[in-house]
Amino acid sequence: MKLKLKNVFLAYFLVSIAGLLYALVQLGQPCDCLPPLRAAAEQLRQKDLRISQLQAELRRPPPAPAQPPEPEALPTIYVVTPTYARLVQKAELVRLSQTLSLVPRLHWLLVEDAEGPTPLVSGLLAASGLLFTHLVVLTPKAQRLREGEPGWVHPRGVEQRNKALDWLRGRGGAVGGEKDPPPPGTQGVVYFADDDNTYSRELFEEMRWTRGVSVWPVGLVGGLRFEGPQVQDGRVVGFHTAWEPSRPFPVDMAGFAVALPLLLDKPNAQFDSTAPRGHLESSLLSHLVDPKDLEPRAANCTRVLVWHTRTEKPKMKQEEQLQRQGRGSDPAIEV
């Protein structure tokens, strides 16, 4: 056993000596190691350069976001709103004015159905912060709705909308606010916004660049979830409506806007108070555009951005009872 261990140890010693001698011999031989070392150094240099570039990009400030056009460069939106005295008038006008205040480059034409300007409307306009023109015209007695009469018997707001068109065409009549009409060449769009509808701010940007007459759907109108144009390949080919679809323009008053230059080029185009039921919008649009040339907006008329809402008429039974007792609400407090 001892002999075997001795032989193993001797063999290990001889192999180690042989390996050492071989290594010593190789140290004296020439070695072509420089090219691989140079390649490795170049790779390290390229990596260092890329790291420096990435660090510089991280330190660089982000690019400024694209800026929207300056307000002065935007076409003006002229919003025409007829209004009349009633208990909810101020509430309606406050809501609408605060929506309009979110829209840049907007001019509000508020037209009262009255003999003269009322303190309520004058004060509201002055406090609104909006660029406005205050107009007044009284609806003729023969065209007024009687108590309890349905709204379709006489279309409301005809005289008031036409009064606003007269002002835009330079025929005067302003009783407050901006009294000078837009100068020739003004780029703008005219929209007829009733005081009781609900409007998305997006709607006004959809209409701003109207070239002729633009259109879109209106929600909660005509006994339907919405009414609006039907669009195919970017063109209006029909209308989704239940009430008399054969009308020349079966659209709601809130569902279109007209380029200001087009209205000024057609000085006789206005609303006809004698138009058949449901044809009031058509009485104006028929003078301005062919249905095939309507400009669909709101994602090809697939989005509803305005709603034909109605505020419930307040019930004043308790107020009337207190008034009979001489204890009615203070009339000096404006509501």
Swiss-Prot record:
Q: How is its activity regulated?
A: Inhibited by EDTA.
Which pathway is it part of? Protein modification; protein glycosylation
From the UniProt entry, list the residue stretches annotated as the region Interaction with galactose moiety of substrate glycoprotein.
243-252
Q: What is this protein called?
A: Galactosylgalactosylxylosylprotein 3-beta-glucuronosyltransferase 3
Please give the tissue specificity annotation from the record for this chain. Ubiquitous (but weakly expressed in all tissues examined).
Write the Enzyme Commission number(s) for this entry: 2.4.1.135
Per UniProt, subunit arrangement is: Homodimer; disulfide-linked. Interacts with PXYLP1; the interaction increases the 2-phosphoxylose phosphatase activity of PXYLP1 during completion of linkage region formation in a B3GAT3-mediated manner.
Please state the pathology the record ties to this protein: Multiple joint dislocations, short stature, and craniofacial dysmorphism with or without congenital heart defects: An autosomal recessive disease characterized by dysmorphic facies, bilateral dislocations of the elbows, hips, and knees, clubfeet, and short stature, as well as cardiovascular defects.
Q: A single GO CC term, please?
A: membrane
Give a short account of its post-translational modification: N-glycosylated.
- UniProt gene name: B3GAT3
Q: Which organism is it from?
A: Homo sapiens
